[in-house]
């Protein structure tokens, strides 16, 4: 039923096994770690790492995805869950509004909601057509013209090419399946063979192609939507962000099923294959001696990696909960134990976010202070002459390495605290933060701690805003939050 992949697979498989779930397409390594896992043939849901290993993506059958995602949030305090029921390959009726560029149009996909859709044929503004989701989002999914129909073995996609799942690696079988698609697919439709096809008989695969083809023909003949909305359900998707504080809870969970080094998942996030193999080897030696090592060694690894960044350009991944966001680059000006100072020089004019009319001018310098496991990034905006223009404090889930040791990352929680040089401090963007709480993305108790933290930062900004401000904000974090990562700030 559930396929599990990635650095979180042992912890998640053990948890889901206790909850009564069954598994499919398991690796031999995972079965060796947890031999009691119950296995069946069909894959309904896949759980895999996000690109930077800071969480997991849960994708597949709607009912199962929802159960898995919210079980993870219930068991792992600090995890952030963004659930989209109408995920990949959901087919919508959309009303074309205006052309954006080339064959890309702005369209209404649900009453009052807009997104962009890529067309495959000429159409006119105001026309209602059918299109399917190719990139899910709770706000504005990216759509592509054509109907998509998903079965357990194959998927039919209008105007698409035939394809085979990357999990089917047998070249002879791939060729056999593609040949089958060319002889049995309806005209104008592409067949995608899902991973379950490799364990099914050709007769069963042919039968499902036929059944979906008949469904496709019926939809094209009988469905003539006049208004935007869902036409054919697709897969659901949940993005479960596991910030550094929640990652330590994952370590504790994993240790119930297999010997686990302290800070195991944070070490794995560094993307260092040699270090990853060393972690695996050490854990094999730890059987029967789970308390042999402390977290001190892992912390020293993190500090060593952070220190090595001094004087270099690094990327900072500013993520939103649903996976969107942006990347900014900066020079690492200094590193002192856990704290890092990042420097950028402004090259183009504009206005600073979070302020009313505060000008951003070429030559301005932005110094950003943060620290490993920091729940804030403190930005000082100064003119080319060194005059302070303002301070912007971004409140976020804990900062950590993102996918490799040259990239830092955090999840933006929406709420920020600002103070222009001659004004009083204020909390901004609170509506975005409260929306996360309302949607169930952020646990209410944890949300309360973040609001207290924001108010504490605001209070600190009412006082002197000198270079010791980041250190005082770090102390506020330690006094408000009680996760293991917050305790590590004393290291």
Curated annotation (Swiss-Prot):
<dbReference type="InterPro" id="IPR007295">
    <property type="entry name" value="DUF402"/>
</dbReference>
<keyword id="KW-0540">Nuclease</keyword>
<dbReference type="InterPro" id="IPR016730">
    <property type="entry name" value="RNA-bd_FAU-1"/>
</dbReference>
<dbReference type="GO" id="GO:0035925">
    <property type="term" value="F:mRNA 3'-UTR AU-rich region binding"/>
</dbReference>
<dbReference type="InterPro" id="IPR035930">
    <property type="entry name" value="FomD-like_sf"/>
</dbReference>
<keyword id="KW-0698">rRNA processing</keyword>
<keyword id="KW-0378">Hydrolase</keyword>
<dbReference type="GO" id="GO:0006364">
    <property type="term" value="P:rRNA processing"/>
</dbReference>
<comment type="function">
    <text>Probable RNase involved in rRNA stability through maturation and/or degradation of precursor rRNAs. Binds to RNA in loop regions with AU-rich sequences.</text>
</comment>
<protein>
    <recommendedName>
        <fullName>Probable ribonuclease FAU-1</fullName>
        <ecNumber>3.1.26.-</ecNumber>
    </recommendedName>
</protein>
<dbReference type="GO" id="GO:0016891">
    <property type="term" value="F:RNA endonuclease activity, producing 5'-phosphomonoesters"/>
</dbReference>
<dbReference type="Pfam" id="PF04167">
    <property type="entry name" value="DUF402"/>
</dbReference>
<keyword id="KW-0255">Endonuclease</keyword>
<keyword id="KW-0694">RNA-binding</keyword>
<comment type="similarity">
    <text>Belongs to the FAU-1 family.</text>
</comment>
<dbReference type="InterPro" id="IPR050212">
    <property type="entry name" value="Ntdp-like"/>
</dbReference>
């Amino acid at each position: 039923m559930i396929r599990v992949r990635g650095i979180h697979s042992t912890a998640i498989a053990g948890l889901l096994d206790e909850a009564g779930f069954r598994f499919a397409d398991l690796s031999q390594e995972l079965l060796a770690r947890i031999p009691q896992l119950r296995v069946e043939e069909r894959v309904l849901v896949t759980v895999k790492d996000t690109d930077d290993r800071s969480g997991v993506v849960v994708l597949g059958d709607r009912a199962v995805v929802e159960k898995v995602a919210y079980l993870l949030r219930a068991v792992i305090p600090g995890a952030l869950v963004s659930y989209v029921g109408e995920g990949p390959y959901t087919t919508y009726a959309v009303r074309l509004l205006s052309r954006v560029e080339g064959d890309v149009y702005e369209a209404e996909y649900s009453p009052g909601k807009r997104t962009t859709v890529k067309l495959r044929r000429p159409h006119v503004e105001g026309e209602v057509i059918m299109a399917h989701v190719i990139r899910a989002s709770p706000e504005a999914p990216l759509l592509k013209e054509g109907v998509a129909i998903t079965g357990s073995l194959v998927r039919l996609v209008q105007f698409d090419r035939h394809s085979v799942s990357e999990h089917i690696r047998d070249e002879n079988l791939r060729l056999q399946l593609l040949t089958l698609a060319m002889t049995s697919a309806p005209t104008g439709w592409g067949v995608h063979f899902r991973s379950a096809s490799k364990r099914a008989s050709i007769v069963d695969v042919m039968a499902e192609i036929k059944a979906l083809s008949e469904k496709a023909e019926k939809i094209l003949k009988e469905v003539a939507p006049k208004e935007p909305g869902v036409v054919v359900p697709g897969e659901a998707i949940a993005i479960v962000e596991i910030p550094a504080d929640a990652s330590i809870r994952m370590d504790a969970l994993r240790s119930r099923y297999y010997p686990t080094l302290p800070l195991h998942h944070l070490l794995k996030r560094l993307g260092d294959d040699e270090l990853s193999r060393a972690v695996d080897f050490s854990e094999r030696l730890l059987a029967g001696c789970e308390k042999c090592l402390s977290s001190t060694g892992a912390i020293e690894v993190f500090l060593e990696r952070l220190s090595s960044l001094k004087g270099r350009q690094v990327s900072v991944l500013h993520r939103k909960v649903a996976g969107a966001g942006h990347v900014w680059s900066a020079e690492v000006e200094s590193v002192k134990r856990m704290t890092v100072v990042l420097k950028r020089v402004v090259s183009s004019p504009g206005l600073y976010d979070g302020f009313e009319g505060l000008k951003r001018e070429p030559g301005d310098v932005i110094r950003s202070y943060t620290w490993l496991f920091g729940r804030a990034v403190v930005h000082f905006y100064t003119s080319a002459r060194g005059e302070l223009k303002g301070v912007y404090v971004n409140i976020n889930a804990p900062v950590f390495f993102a996918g490799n040791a040259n990239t830092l990352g955090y999840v933006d929680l929406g709420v920020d605290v600002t103070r222009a040089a001659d004004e009083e401090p204020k909390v901004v963007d609170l509506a975005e933060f409260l929306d996360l709480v309302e949607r169930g993305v952020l646990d209410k108790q944890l949300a309360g701690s973040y609001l207290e933290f924001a108010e504490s930062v605001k209070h600190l900004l009412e006082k002197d805003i000198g270079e010791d401000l980041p250190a005082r904000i770090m102390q506020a974090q330690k006094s408000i939050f009680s996760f293991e990562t917050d305790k590590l700030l004393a290291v």
